[in-house]
């Protein structure tokens, strides 16, 4: 019985070390300031963003916000992450979790890199961890990231 308990604990601990990551990027023919303005105008998300359909709350470091996402071919999901980093024109990140830390956590990050030639590399990534991460299929979420990136690119380059 003791051996089974120890094996179970070891198994659960190994699952917490598992992680998955999605990373997408695109080069946009616009300055970081222009892209940041679009990216942080959350009230406009329903009009252009096919993946993150809503962000409410004050987006400042350590604040809790409410985010609605709609991965392709999936139902809408709502979660309440904490803002980790907000550096104007450069980076925005948050940490979301399922019920409590360690079950299923996601650290989402948007990064803007000024290429010095009038273009910006936009990187969107998320690192997933926790004991339930092995159940998560990243395919639809990555597709949603790419769709959002493309719409952001189109909007920034057309206005």
Q: Where do the model's predicted regions map?
A:
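A short, structured loop/turn motif at beta-sheet edges
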Residues: 29-32, 60, 84-90, 111-121, ...
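N-terminal, post-signal-peptide region of Sec/Tat-exported proteins
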Residues: 46-82
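A conserved amphipathic terminal alpha-helix motif
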Residues: 104, 109, 121-159
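Hydrophobic ligand-binding cavity/cleft-lining segments
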Residues: 15-60, 147, 151
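Envelope-exposed proteins and targeting segments
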Residues: 22-24, 63, 79, 108, ...
């Amino acid at each position: 019985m003791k051996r089974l308990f120890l094996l179970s604990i070891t198994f659960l601990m190994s699952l917490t070390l598992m992680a998955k990551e999605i990373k997408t990027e695109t080069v946009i023919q616009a300055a970081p300031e222009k892209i940041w303005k679009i990216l942080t105008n959350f009230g406009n998300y329903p009009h252009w963003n096919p993946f993150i359909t809503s962000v409410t709350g004050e987006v400042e470091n350590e604040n809790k916000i409410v985010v609605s996402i709609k991965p392709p071919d999936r139902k809408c999901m709502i979660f309440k992450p904490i803002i980790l980093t907000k550096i104007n024109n450069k980076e925005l990140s948050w940490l979301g979790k399922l019920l409590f830390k360690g079950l299923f956590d996601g650290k989402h990050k948007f990064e803007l890199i000024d290429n010095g030639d009038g273009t910006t590399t936009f990187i969107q990534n998320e690192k997933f961890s926790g004991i339930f991460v092995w159940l998560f299929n990243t395919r639809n979420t990555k597709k949603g990231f790419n769709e959002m990136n493309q719409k952001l690119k189109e909007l920034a380059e057309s206005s």
